[in-house]
Amino acid sequence: KLNKPLYTVACHDDLTAADLVGRHLIGPNGTYWQDGPLTRAVREGGICYLDEIVEARKDTTVVLHPLADDRRILPLERTGELLQAAPGFMLVVSYNPGYQNLLKGMKASTRQRFVALRFSYPEPMLEQQIVMQESQIDAELAAKLVDLAGALRRLESDLDEVASTRLLIYAGRMISSGMPPLQVCRCCLAEPLSDDLLTVEALMEVARLYFAE
């Protein structure tokens, strides 16, 4: 709808500033400069989306600072350029706050340069519609999966992560393919949430309240 080029970067520990900005490469005619996704978005007035930004090192994300404040510039030290962001340029980052710890989290100086939106799980009726549409299952089964997810999410204090809408969609697809519902609950909802056998069995006890043997 925005009709803008979108550059998506999956952040990780080994991501460097050069991966975002660009680097010199060797070609048949010598060295040449190759723009990174951030630089291309800046030049074109596109959208640069950094997924799971807290996975990137803090010394990498500081390259965003002059772009994310009122300067709207990107210095390219290796070429000597000082790029002014083209009209329409957008910088979008995302992360799951539950993953943060003492070692992983956004620098305060980085976070304060962004407008923040907090997203929670969809309302049950909306989530049911999403699961129905994405996994092609009926309303009754989708409602059971969403209710089960709600029960599991209430156990979030005992789990590193709780059942996501994505997992419900996977479960719906596997049930519609013919796999027994309880086996699907184990494979798609219990096992992915914990490596501890006792915890998995406790989650399965909850699942048995919604799906018969």
Question: Which residues are covered by each model-predicted region?
Answer:
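C-terminal regulatory/interaction module of P-loop NTP-utilizing enzymes
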Residues: K1-E213
